[in-house]
Amino acid sequence: MCLFIETIRIDHGRVCNLSRHNRRLNDTRAHFWPESTPLQLSDYLSSPGCGAGITGAGIVKARVVYGEKGIEDLSYSPYAVRHVHSLALMQTDTIDYTYKSAGREPLNCLFALRGACDDILIVKQGLLTDTSIANIALSDGTHWYTPAHPLLKGTKRAALLEEGILQEKDIRPEDLPSFSTVRLFNAMIDWGELELPVRNITP
């Protein structure tokens, strides 16, 4: 069975970026199952439902698993950012994560090759894309640029582009010396919450 996921940040009871998560869920279902009925995540998510003793955690991760029949599973857990201090460049031209599949085996296999680094930065067809868990942006000291062709067009990325905080750009590994800082972000990692110097990206 083909399953997909949405990972949604709940910040002290506030569901973040819900409209974009909802749009991606329904776009995915329409692509794979054109006859599917649109769903409203708000019908399934509720901040009281995040309870069972974890609402006091502050930041909660809601993990929604869905497929052809609709929502298959919904779980909540306290969330803490996993710190990343180094990235290993990893080349692959075959990986495809256009849709947020519950099956992450290709990403997990690449992640296992990271060596002493904390995470990987995937290079596809000569261009930087994403880490194993996040979109990225690079700063030249004036502007923030995000790869124009990420593996997954994340909901946080879409919001930052719309707000004018990010600009899309084709970025190659050989362009890295032009930048000073790399930021990682996704639905759970806020903008500016996780960054490291570009010199900590290793071939």
Which stretches of residues belong to each language-model region?
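Short beta-strand/strand-turn micro-motif
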Residues: 129-135
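Short beta-strand-to-turn element immediately C-terminal to the catalytic PLP-Schiff-base lysine
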Residues: 138-139
